[in-house]
Amino acid sequence: MLDAPAPAPAPPDALLRLPNPLVLALIAVYCGVELVLQGADLHLWGRALWRPLAYQYGGFWAGLMRGGWLANYPGQTPAMFVTHSFLHAGLSHLLGHMIALVALANLLADRIGRLEFLALWMLSALAGAFVFGLIGPASQPMVGTSGALFGLAGLLVVREAQSRRADGQSLRAVLVSVLVWLLGLTALNLGSWWLQNGVLAWQAHLGGFLAGLAWGLARGLARDQRHPGPA
C-alpha cells in the first residue's frame, strides 16, 4: 500500500468564489479580443472583415497541420496552436466558455497551484488543437478555449477518483463516479452539438480531456513516488 497524502476535496463554496488573479487575467484577455471583434461587427470601429480575417489568420486549420496548404504568413502553422484559443465564435460562445472556466478553476483552486494551472491550460489547448488537426474537418477553422477547458475537466475527474479512493471507497464506487462524470461530459457535448446545429469541435474536447487525464495520472504517480508507504 501507499501512504501518500490524499487529494483534498473541493470546498462546498468553491463555485461561489471570485476567481484568482490568473483566471481573471485570462478572462480579461479573451473578453478583450471578442470585444474588439464585436465592435467591428457592429461597425463601431475597424471593419466588418476583422472577424473573418481573425479566423483566417488566427483560427486553427487542420489542413495546414496536415500539409498541402499554403500559410498566410510564415509561422502560421505553429502559431495557430496558440492563437485559436483566444478567438471565439461570438458572445454566446465566449460566455459559455468563461462560465466554465470560472467553475472549473474554482473547483481546482485548492488542489493545484497557479503555475500548474497555467501549464495544464496551455498543454490541453495544444493537445485539443493537435487532435482536431488529426481528425477534424480540414476546411473549417476551430476557435475557442474548449480544449483547455476539457483538460481541466480531465484533471478534475482524476482528482475526484483519487480522493474517493483515498477515503476508502471501493473501486466500484470510484468507477461509478468516473462514469457519471463521463456521461455528464458526453451529455454536455451532445447538448452543445444540438444547440450549435452540429457545429462542434468535439475533437478538440477529446484531445484536451485526454491531456487532463494524463496530467492527473502522471501527477498521482509522481506524488506516490515522493511519499512511498510500506509494501
Question: Residues of each region from the PLM?
Answer:
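A detector for small-residue-rich transmembrane helices and their helix-helix packing motifs
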Residues: 2-231
